[in-house]
């Protein structure tokens, strides 16, 4: 009979099989009431599952991350329960957990309106408030199939036929009259599922295949308590205010249009930000001793076949043909950099050779996945490839890691999560090659005292990689930087150097990107700063304004002086009230507004206001210019007097 070992090392002995709920009751009624599931020998199980042999047990409650995930999964079932009551002929497909919530794909003979979604959410609340027990039954494959055939649930039948072995015992979860199928675990009672909200609907193909029927996907969020739900909804509200698409339109940064899906039309102010980022990156390339190159954006398909990209990546590549030759528009820069490396004989004395490019790349992303600047088809990578010997790998990866943290700190990103992605099932190269590559990356991270976690199977097909995920002011994750070893591509493209022994050797390539897509990074910065870009990055850094026509000449002289000092400045001489001008430029997020009245003209000074509404008073013009230059030169995140 089972001996149950608890997390504190204490043991409980039983003369019969027990469930996690039984053990929780044995410990105390308070814990039993809070029990959502159990972790038995490291595996999540339902609170009602029986433990027949000696085992370790942790009780899972809403305070645990796993508990919250189970609540969200059960809310998906609750959605199914409610929608089948409102529209009984609905066919249920899949309802998994996603970040911060859940969704359910449904086949419904009507397009859900906002009113329908509100009615569905209301019915979900009515059902949850009944606090009914969720009953789990393990049944045979045949019984499960018969159950869903009788209920007309063709998608569940398809899952059973195609994804579940005939000797398996699927779990059926009974929510009163509603039945769903799942591996589980799920909540034992719906009292845990009171704090949720349906968020939106979207289209989704069954099994993600555009040849299949388009279903309706209903998204929801769910939390352990009302406070957490409200906090999340407030974060979403703030995120909506910061949406880069909205701010991009307000500030006239860029636009997208149907004739060029996923391609950016940069306007003057947006392109100014883009070019300033390039200047910043170039300064770091110089500091870390990189060459800058430029390769063609289109190359013969034969080259992409040599690299392995054609076999592994062709669905994401745009192609064209001319004079009976097929060309691929590059989705990445590495093959072109190898061609540059291959020009001329290289010696071990030439290594490491660090080659960088603002590479214009194109990928055929699905139209439904496109999202402003965050997901595009045409983008520019701050890409680099380091050609080095095996002995140089560790030092070069260390330098890449330092460069990543150096650059991110400029923008104020402090929370950075690092993951090491290992070999995928679909890959090129030997296991020995992968063993060596993965070990080199892990050691480099350890030497820099950087905590990291493994992402098993998530590496690129040609090598493992380190991924740097930064978190913004709303605690949203953005995966931007990568450092990736590649022992395969150099040999595929015949790259070589002459070693100290006068023998030809194959270099190692380290693929390195820090900002990633420049377009996406500008989208991230737009939302991080809510359009209040630091002065060095702002498209217009200063606006000089007159109060009446009598100050126009002084404004023009001051504007010219600021321009000569390297400051991006505009003069506003319109015949408008000064309050109107200040409001307009404040809405445009211009960092500084310099107001010139008669007193300022007489004293040779200027009244300085910030976009945050702070009045810095009347200051000497030369002092203002000097302070602005220092703020811009240092790429400060703070404005004067902040």
Curated annotation (Swiss-Prot):
SUPFAM superfamilies (UniProt xref): Class II aaRS ABD-related, Class II aaRS and biotin synthetases, TGS-like, ThrRS/AlaRS common domain
Cofactor binding remark: Binds 1 zinc ion per subunit.
Cofactor requirement: Zn(2+)
GO molecular function, one term: tRNA binding
CDD domains: TGS_ThrRS, ThrRS_anticodon, ThrRS_core
Enzyme class: ligase
Subcellular location: Cytoplasm
Segments forming domain TGS: 1-61
EC number: 6.1.1.3
Segments of this protein annotated with the region Catalytic: 243-534
Family: Belongs to the class-II aminoacyl-tRNA synthetase family.
Function: Catalyzes the attachment of threonine to tRNA(Thr) in a two-step reaction: L-threonine is first activated by ATP to form Thr-AMP and then transferred to the acceptor end of tRNA(Thr). Also edits incorrectly charged L-seryl-tRNA(Thr).
NCBIfam families in UniProt: thrS (TIGR00418)
Full protein name: Threonine--tRNA ligase
Organism listed in the record: Salmonella paratyphi A (strain AKU_12601)
